[in-house]
Design a protein with these regions (language model features):
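Transmembrane helix-bundle signature of multi-pass secondary active exporters and lipid flippases
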Residues: 17-70, 134-141, 203, 230-295, ...
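Hydrophobic transmembrane alpha-helices of multi-pass small-molecule transporters
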Residues: 56-59, 171-175, 201-205, 277-280, ...
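Hydrophobic/aromatic residues in alpha-helical transmembrane segments
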Residues: 15, 31, 68-69, 109-110, ...
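Short runs within selected transmembrane alpha-helices of multi-pass transporters and secretion channels
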Residues: 65, 134-152, 160-168, 189-202, ...
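Small-residue-rich hydrophobic transmembrane alpha-helices
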Residues: 44-104, 141-160, 267-331, 362-385
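Helix-loop interface residues and adjacent transmembrane-helix termini in multi-pass membrane transporters
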Residues: 29, 38-41, 75-78, 153-154, ...
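Short alpha-helical transmembrane segments in multi-pass integral membrane proteins
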Residues: 1-14, 72-137, 181-237, 293-358, ...
Length: 437
């Protein structure tokens, strides 16, 4: 990515990432569609409320993946093959340890977290079951995502897309077999996700082991190289903390939503699944910007980094505008895919129409943040995200719930936080020393 036409390099790298994330969102959404239609709206609410906890616990692992990706992309851009080799094997060691820890912690804390969230009794048991089965397979998810991060860091986003497509198709068939055919209910949905993640994990590790490129994986060489571990942690921890704290703020929002009952929870769950089809492509463009910036920082090409930031920001904002318009127009039809319960559909549409007009701000915020992380300035990006997407939301919810119990007021914590984050990020780009090499 250090040579060639910038917009083509970013776009052609981002497209497989976008398709991959859409496929990943697809098999998460299929869980909800099948559960909502074949198990019931309470089960849909259980799956939806589980999402906040899943995001909370995997956030730190995503941070580690970001740190590894920045380190690998900078080594790759500088043509430091030994650095790439050591960073890849350190990344895999982190993935294995993090995956095991996530499994144990996730299964253990699930009941307590759901109680803290005020999950209604009629969906509590199903939420516990779904989450604990899901976390049973979290090792596969962590290993796959960090392995895909290695491929993305060296510019090979197409290969991970193929394996994710296989996993998505497998998940759909497994959902139909386990939920519809075997009548395993919410357990079947979680098992289908676990097995599909295992399939993608096997495929991507097989490719890395067979590869003859600089990122070839050798099982016997998996270990933590101290100097690289500290560098990955130094870059990754701010992103991990950012993800965890933002997930905590979303957990607080989910807790507020739970207080309105299972029907509202189901409507919110349906919206969140659809929202993924906007945010995940934006995050894919952000990841492309991170890799582009990392490789060109390694190659000592700051002007190319700056131009790449402008181009990728236009891409992210443009995509968000298009999806926002489409979802505003087709909101009832889209939410109606998840359930036949008309009240749930009404709440889902109500929530969706609060957010869609403001998606473009989220696009700008995330893509600028991705570029800044690629230069290694993850601490600065973390501060912007924490102030806006966490601090502001928590204060808004605290004030809103003390003043009035209105679903609309709760939902309105999101757009102003996106505006604040976008403005702070633009200010940092304009005045900050983010391009210092």
């Amino acid at each position: 990515m250090t040579e060639g036409v910038i917009w083509k390099e970013i776009l052609f790298f981002a497209i497989p990432l976008i398709l991959g994330n859409l496929f990943q969102q697809l098999y998460n959404t299929v869980d909800s569609i099948i559960v909502g239609n074949y198990v019931g709206s309470n089960a849909l609410a259980a799956v939806g409320s589980s999402g906040a906890i899943i995001n909370l616990l995997i956030g730190f692992c995503i941070g580690a993946s970001t740190g590894a990706g920045v380190v690998i992309s900078q080594f790759y851009g500088a043509k430091n093959t030994e650095g790439v080799r050591k960073a890849v094997h350190t990344t895999m060691a982190i993935a294995l340890v993090a995956g095991v820890l996530l499994t144990v912690i996730g299964i253990t804390v699930t009941p307590s977290m759901l109680r803290l969230m005020g999950t209604p009794d009629k969906v509590f048991e199903q939420s516990v079951i779904y989450l604990q089965v899901y976390f049973g397979g979290s090792l596969f998810s962590v290993v796959y995502n960090m392995s895909a991060g290695v491929l993305n860091a060296v510019g090979n986003s197409r290969r991970s897309l193929v394996y994710l497509m296989i996993a998505a198709i497998s998940n759909i068939f497994l959902d139909l077999i386990m939920v519809v055919g075997l009548k395993l209910g919410i357990v079947g949905a979680a098992l289908a996700t676990d097995i599909s993640q295992l399939i993608s994990c096997i495929f991507i590790w097989g490719f890395l082991i067979r590869s003859e490129d600089v990122y070839k994986l050798k099982i016997k060489e998996i270990r933590c190289y101290d100097h690289l571990l500290s560098k990955i942690i130094r870059i990754g921890i701010p992103t991990g903390i950012q993800n965890i704290v933002i997930s905590l703020s979303n957990l607080i929002v989910q807790t507020s939503v739970n207080s309105f009952g299972a029907t509202v929870m189901a409507g919110f769950a349906a919206y969140i699944k659809i929202d993924g089809f906007n945010i995940l492509p934006v995050l894919s463009i952000s990841m492309a910007a991170t890799t582009f910036a990392g490789q060109n920082i390694g190659a000592r090409k700051p002007d190319r980094v700056r131009k790449g930031m402008y181009i990728s920001t236009v891409m992210g904002a443009g995509y968000s505008v298009l999806t926002g318009i489409m979802l505003l127009i087709f909101a009832p039809q889209v939410i109606g895919v998840f359930t036949t319960n008309q009240k749930v559909v009404e709440y889902g549409v109500y929530i969706m129409r609060y957010f869609c007009p403001f998606y473009w701000m989220l696009g700008i915020l995330h893509v600028l943040g991705g570029t800044i992380r690629g230069t290694g300035k993850t601490m600065q990006a973390m501060v912007v995200f924490l102030v806006s997407l966490c601090g502001f939301r928590v204060m808004w919810i605290a004030g809103t719930m003390a003043w009035t119990r209105s679903l609309g007021h709760v939902m309105m914590c999101y757009p102003p936080s996106w505006l604040l984050g976008m403005l702070l990020m633009l200010l940092y780009v304009w005045k900050g020393k983010w391009m210092d090499l």
